[in-house]
Amino acid sequence: EDYRRSLYLHEYETKLISQRMPRNVEDTLVQTFYNTHRQQLILTETIIQGLLLVVPNQAPKLDELKKKIQQPELEENIEWIEKFAYQYATGYELFTDEWKTTSDIIVLMPLEQDNLDKQLKNKRQIEIQDSINTYLLQVTDLHMKGDEKPITYARKEIEEILLRQRQVEFIQQERNKLYNKAIETGKLKLYENE
């Protein structure tokens, strides 16, 4: 019977949260949380921004491509790279405005994660060639394993933490409201021991 009541209560609280609790988290709250807790927000894996191309070894203009990917921030280079990728590449990922983990990257190129991490410490452009393809990785930004997470990467995690905190507070407030209303309407009476 207690188990059933707790299931009903949980279902009621879940519906209350979905219907009445605000889901948006203000930027200022995220920034404040980040500033206060950034030492606890540590990367468990290296993350990068940049671009990756997988190109057949016989593709034309490979040397020109290698020069263009060194400056992916230039709009004309990105346009040229995208046209090239559309025509010749077997794989193309542009992630200059989003973070990818090194484990996301090694799925796309023949390289061990530890080896990639070691290479990333020393260089921003990595080129690997096998019998069929050339793999070109250009890194525009990176944070190594053990570094503090950048706020752009930690944002979703922080929002989830803040929403969980808000949920706990919201449920407590709703319980208090129900408790006070029950006392006011006489549905709940308090007796004091003498």
Model regions and ranges:
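Peptidyl-prolyl cis-trans isomerase
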Residues: 1-194
